[in-house]
Amino acid sequence: MQRVSRSLNYIGHSSTCAQYLRDAFVQVQTSGLVFKDTLRVEAFDDPKVAGVQLYLSDFQRPVTEKLAKGDVFSDPSQGGLGCSYRGKVVVSATASTKPDGEQVFSESRSLIFKSLNVRRFVDKEGESVVYAVYSQRLDKNEDSNNSRFKSNLCAVHVDEFQSGAAAAP
């Protein structure tokens, strides 16, 4: 295993947001004889929810498979998501409480039209914050593994909602 660094595009932030990324990046070679698929596990923080650690796992195809399929600019667009608390979980007053949630980040999985996304949903009644990972693609015909129908969730109990936490854009 080795540490790797990747750039995630956090919504509302123009930089690579290194302050939200943790140093617990892992890259593991999995299936394949010589050129193997790579399982990546990354840890990151939600900038609007203190005390939560999110873990995202996804796969990267080897360059030989990309060349053989003639699709060198894309990777699978499905991921696993887990979360844990690292202390008191506090939801910022600026976090959206709308039913459609708020996008935490989006990562491009091809040159154009395909991305892996994580959204946050605040459940004030259930005193929880829920995260969902899903893929988004423009061309629904080229989806051989039905990744557009796959998602993953995790939830963490909230200790405090900061006052003024109204529906924000």
Residue ranges and their predicted role:
Residues M1-D75:
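N-terminal secretory signal peptides
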Residues Y10, T30, S77-G80, Y85, ...:
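Intrinsically disordered, low-complexity segments enriched in small/polar residues
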Residues S14, V34, Q53, G82-S84, ...:
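Compositionally biased, intrinsically disordered low-complexity regions
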Residues A43, L56, Y85, F121, ...:
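Hydrophobic side chains in beta-strands
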Residues F44-D46, F59, R86-K88, Q136, ...:
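Generic structural motif
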Residues K48-L56, E65-G79, Y131-A132, N141-A155:
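Short, well-ordered strand-loop elements centered on a beta-strand within folded domains, enriched
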Residues D58-S106:
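Acidic, aromatic-enriched beta-alpha/helix-loop junctions
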Residues V90-P169:
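Low-complexity intrinsically disordered segments
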